[in-house]
Amino acid sequence: MGMQYDVKSQYAIASGLVLPFRTRVKAFQFGAATSSAGTVGLYDNFAIAGTYTRTTTVATVTAVRHGLIVGDWAFIDWSGGANPTDDFYQVATVVDANTFTVAVVNTGDPSGVATVYNDVLVISTVSTGNDVFNIIPGEGILAQNGVRVFLENSVPLTVYYG
């Protein structure tokens, strides 16, 4: 396989959709966090609408055909009043094909709406002193529906794709 010449880049300084089309992530660079270490991640732009109930520190999420297994990471966007923080959560248990649980802080509404992004492409923690740069081997990571990012603590991102 020869050199690929059609690699492009996209810069982002806020969470959201950065590439609204099917592509392959070839490399990425997360800049150093400005205030304290931060979690950053890229995930496929495919969301599953769901609901949640919370009992103390456990949120039970119902999202039809979530496809997750214990130990997987999902980005969950909690909607509504006082709710858990939008963030990456590791799946603690899988009840069935439509229900799973995650650990959350014991605060907020006991139930509400949750949007689940179950296809995490890259997740990393960035310190205040160092950038993170990674080249993806082979053909890169396929994002079927585009690339959405979560950037915490003012971490800038450059994603290389093609």
Protein language model regions, located:
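Small/polar beta-strand repeat architecture
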Residues: 48-121
